[in-house]
Amino acid sequence: MRVVLIGRLLIGVLALRELLAQGEDVVGVVVSSLDPYPGLPSEESVRKLANRERLPVLQIPLNKVNEPDVLQAIRKLKPDLIMSPFPSVPFCQELLRIPSIGCINFHPSKLPEAKGFTTSLYHMYRGDDQNWITLHWLDEGVDTGPILSQGAAGIDREDTGFTIRRKTFEVARGLLRDALPLLRQGKAPRIEQLPVPEGRPYSFNWQPSFAEIDWTASSQQVVRRVRTLSHPKDFAFETSAAYTTFLSRRLFVWDAREDDRDARMIAGCEPGQVLAATGDGIGIRTGDGSIVATDITLDEDQDGDSLGALDLLGMRVPTVLG
């Protein structure tokens, strides 16, 4: 098949690698004008991979993919298939009609639930035990096209948003691997989306405020939020680490665990109250118990050593955070 990839970030790199591994004729690669992205390793650059493979590259702001000059450039490539992992905008009808087979996309949720452009952390944030990804056909809507296939990575206790992201992208690569022969043969499924299951959202749009810790939540929920938003401090992740406020400044919590502190020791303490320093961190009261924050930094010291913040908190027991 003649394939045009419109892609970005690690998911775009993995999709391009799989297309090449399967011997597809990648006739063009459309990448972001920001690629390679500041703060991301070279392994997440679609442009660098395309250049190494000597593929034709068109570098544009990806939200301009529907512009007439871009459409003309893609049309000249005469693609059978457009593969677009995580598009930045819905495709216009003119773009959708260019490839003879169609346009396909990865969406990081178990469609039909959680449509939208910022859903990568949706399943882990909700507390699900699996992080789903859907390969689907594109139409003019936002994640409303027929489903081709779905898969999931199990969320382990030690997973963070950073690690589950990578695990899920590998699942996505496997979905593409299985789909390519079906696409060549004209046998790829087009499963119409069912109504959204009761209790699950139609769409999910990440808000920066979601990163703020609610200390009235359970210890399990607080730790889950911390782990969902945890990532290497030098990595340009899609959101900040989980945070609370301390002395009118943001205090980022990068790692935490549930505490087995005796309930009698925290009786009378309010949620968010700093309890005491432990061997590996700071105990903090939650809605139903306590957690130990084991890696924290103050706002201006995100890239620095966490010990300064831990020591500062330890000297201010019983400070109330938030």
Predicted regions and their residues:
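Low-complexity, polar-biased intrinsically disordered regions enriched in Pro/Ser/Thr/Gly
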Residues: 232-239, 263-269
